């Protein structure tokens, strides 16, 4: 498996709002995070949702975001993070 991004690499979630079924939460789009794990390749869930074959398979990443970067006015600890599983087609180099 050849992954486009490596553990420790900074990425930005695409800020796109296509119609239909998407697996990327709105709240994380446009934000910068760091790859924590390359999970593996899986069938594309956005295609599977419509009864298609899910090909080509996409690489899934576990990406960590600082809470204070995601939520305006966040007053928790600056060490607080959110970890979101995101497919490669939603990520860009930071």
Task: Describe each model-derived feature in a short phrase.
Residues 1-94:
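Basic/aromatic-rich interaction segments and small domains that mediate binding to polyanionic partners
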